[in-house]
């Protein structure tokens, strides 16, 4: 499948670059591509419900089982809209931001939504201290998604109580694991689980999602970089712990910057020399030093 999240990342990157450098000429050049990207994301809503539909393998977790209205893609698109609007200051974009924010907050955790997106599934949704990974026609995918939840913290979605409980959950999980970092998704899917066949068959070349590795509960420095970024203002000491953990993994084998690690054993997995592993450390470190980003 194609990658839905690349559009949002492009917009976030351009807007933050413009904000940092004040290179308005560059932004002017990129404005039309940005607007085309936002228009395409609107088209991928399919029924104008303010939630983008993402095919399986349609984002960074390209061999995982999430599909449908994936939470990570919704909050990433919201971040892109907010970044763009801080430069453009558009009433139209402001209204879209409000609608997208409302439908996210009302549908990805149990509560008192009067008009849930998936009424039958929402009725049986159990309360958890984090945002659900996805909604699709079959119901909710309720695993913990560290990347999506980290971006949600960055954007301050949910009320104070929800965010407090969210961080408590994430910290309890992080501290319970060998590497003292968050896994990409949790719990791992095992061969005896109902979803195993779906996971096992979703690979193009070779199967990498054994339990505790890759997207199936593996630890990614890049993902933890965004978690550290999201809590750096409120909990700088915790952010510092996470940065130290990221640097420890990146420095394996003479700074080989491995893609990810086995959460259970701590062994390096994935390919070497990944720029995104280095980027996770940089963004976490700079955030904890007071560097601000559009959000």
Language-model regions, residue ranges each:
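Aromatic-rich carbohydrate-recognition surfaces in CAZymes
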Residues: 1-48, 70-78, 163, 220-231, ...
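N-terminal hydrophobic or amphipathic segments with adjacent small-residue motifs
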Residues: 43, 146, 211-212, 260
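Catalytic cores of carbohydrate-active enzymes
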Residues: 49-55, 59, 67-70, 76-198, ...
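A ubiquitous short alpha-helical element
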Residues: 65-69, 211-213
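C-terminal substrate/ligand-recognition segments
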Residues: 191-237, 282
